[in-house]
């Protein structure tokens, strides 16, 4: 039978047998469709963690914390599988809510929403939460802001202070915000006002507090991370504001005269499609045209529900990196020229 360059690698059907998650992922590298893409994302992420002088940035959108993903993200932070987190404010509000002992509840997307409203229950697809508890948390944020006083700070600085406050209150160690505080992983929230944290800060503002979250300082600080890193890789859960906030750093650095190659690893888990023209489904090949991602970067886009992908990928990485020491970046924000980065084992 005639063969050519296109038919050198046959697919291998998956056997059902006893094996680890990482072994299953390795086996799926020779399958097809999004199963193979999921396996390729594990391979790319694992390889990225082996690279020297590399900073890994994660963009986190969607209601991942109410859906039960907070311990996955906090694990990735503690194990330094990510070095910087850009998130929606909602995820971090929900994380703080749970860190202080509150809960989200298993619900149903078929519930009667009018009845839920009458009982003070909020619905996030098939997850429930208690509105009164959310409002208590809003006021807790307002009280905390008043304790900070009248300052102007980046969202990174604010989230650091919030992490410190959660630790003081005895918050759970599996919190995203607490883990980031303890492990010196910066968190940026470029749309902080679009969340219950923003609601809490608005309450404080109405009480007379003049606390400003400097979002342009956010842009400057995260761009410094990219400028001063040896190499950068990105992992996007969904898209939206967190994705573009990270993507635009390469463009900003270039405009400011820095020689940046674009992100050298790029992974995304998304349920959006590219043909609608939105950023959440935008391909990494399109990002190459902007200079956001290097042309020769390892690019893996997986079209999948992130609540399916994240637990599988995290378990596979846990198995693949066991006993491996990574050279993770250490950030110092008080240097004479702003941010300083050292890569330490």
UniProtKB/Swiss-Prot annotation:
Catalytic site: 292 (nucleophile)
Keyword NAD: yes
Protein name, per record: Probable deoxyhypusine synthase 2
Transmembrane segments: none
Keyword Transferase part of the UniProt annotation: yes
Keywords attached to this entry: Hypusine biosynthesis, NAD, Transferase
A GO CC annotation given for this chain: cytoplasm
Species: Methanosarcina mazei (strain ATCC BAA-159 / DSM 3647 / Goe1 / Go1 / JCM 11833 / OCM 88) (Methanosarcina frisia)
Classification via Pfam families: DS
Cited InterPro entries: Deoxyhypus_synthase_arc, Deoxyhypusine_synthase, Deoxyhypusine_synthase_sf, DHS-like_NAD/FAD-binding_dom
Family: Belongs to the deoxyhypusine synthase family.
Cofactor(s) for this UniProt protein: NAD(+)
Lineage: superkingdom: Archaea
One term of GO molecular function: deoxyhypusine synthase activity
Disulfide feature: none
Pathway membership, UniProt: Protein modification; eIF5A hypusination
Catalytic activity from the UniProt record: [eIF5A protein]-L-lysine + spermidine = [eIF5A protein]-deoxyhypusine + propane-1,3-diamine
